[in-house]
Each structure stands twice: as structure tokens, then as C-alpha cells.
């Protein structure tokens, strides 16, 4: 939310979550779970959170695409993201649920933007014209793989030892 709230390319028009948070102001839904150094952005703090499942028709009618980052079981996430795609709404997912789905591209744009070429195959499976799901890589990978990629291309990297320490975000 903090990265998108004042971004020049995006306008947050809807926020959705589980039925537990639906109907609440975003500020109230987040409550004490807000862990950022900054305050909840003014643009979104008073927005009413919608039910991501029950309000799918309304949400997909109002948005161009969805950024999905939900705390649910993997099978529930898969179902939810596929429903949005089937409603002809592109989904860019932060979740791991579809990272091993063969026709869902895991995109690190600087490295493998061409992986989006699999989307027509996914659309055929889902029966969609516009809707699709694309996922981002694990947060750890996206920090060091862009630096390793050109080194591998130039010199051939055989082994890498990586240590990660999880942040509050998971």
C-alpha cells in the first residue's frame, strides 16, 4: 500500500480482504498489525475494505487489474486468483500459491520478461480473453538474482551460498 499510494502510474480504487475485515475502514481493518515506519497513507486509510470473495463481481467491474497479497491457505489463494482471472481481471500476485503452476509466469522483469509468453496458454486453460495470473518471485530471490544473472551470463556461476533472514513482512 505504501509503495502504491502515491505512485504516479497507479490509482488505488478498491481494497479487499477476507470477510473478517470486509466493511471496515482500511485503518481499522489493519489495526495494530500496521508495521510500517510511516503512517497509513491518507488516500487509503478511510477506504472501506471489501470482501475479496463475495464482492468479486463489483471489484472486477471497477479495476483494471489486481495486486494480490493475501494471508490465506494456498488452495484458497489459487481459487481466489483464478476467479479474478476468470472475471477477465489480470492478477499480479505476491503469493506463492501459483509459483509452481506450469502456465503461470514467475516474472523478474529485468531477467525473464519473455516468460509472459506463456499467458496465452494459461488463458486457454482458464477460458479467458483478458484475465491471467502472473506471480513475482520470492522476496529473497529478487534481491540478489538480478546481480547474479549478468555474472552467470558472462562467467558462468556454478555455486552460490545465500543466507536470508526473514523480516517482519514474512
Where are these regions (language model features)?
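N-terminal Rossmann-like NAD(P) cofactor-binding subdomain of oxidoreductases
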Residues: 1-170
Amino acid at each position: 500500500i505504501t509503495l502504491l499510494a502515491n505512485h504516479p502510474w497507479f490509482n488505488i480504487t478498491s481494497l479487499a480482504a477476507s470477510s473478517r475485515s470486509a466493511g471496515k475502514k482500511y485503518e481499522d481493518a489493519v489495526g495494530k498489525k500496521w508495521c510500517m515506519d510511516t503512517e497509513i497513507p491518507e488516500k487509503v486509510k478511510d477506504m472501506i475494505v471489501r470482501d475479496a470473495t463475495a464482492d468479486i463481481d463489483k471489484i472486477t467491474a471497477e479495476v483494471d487489474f489486481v495486486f494480490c497479497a493475501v494471508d490465506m491457505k494456498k488452495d484458497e489463494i489459487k481459487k481466489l486468483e483464478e476467479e479474478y482471472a476468470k472475471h477477465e481481471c489480470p492478477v499480479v500476485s505476491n503469493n506463492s500459491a501459483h509459483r509452481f503452476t506450469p502456465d503461470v509466469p514467475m516474472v523478474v522483469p529485468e531477467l525473464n520478461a519473455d516468460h509472459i509468453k506463456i499467458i496465452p496458454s494459461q488463458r486457454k486453460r482458464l477460458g479467458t480473453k483478458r484475465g491471467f495470473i502472473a506471480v513475482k518471485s520470492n522476496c529473497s530471490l529478487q534481491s540478489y538474482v538480478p546481480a547474479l544473472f549478468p555474472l552467470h551470463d558472462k562467467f558462468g556461476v556454478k555455486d552460490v551460498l545465500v543466507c536470508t533472514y526473514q523480516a517482519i513482512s514474512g
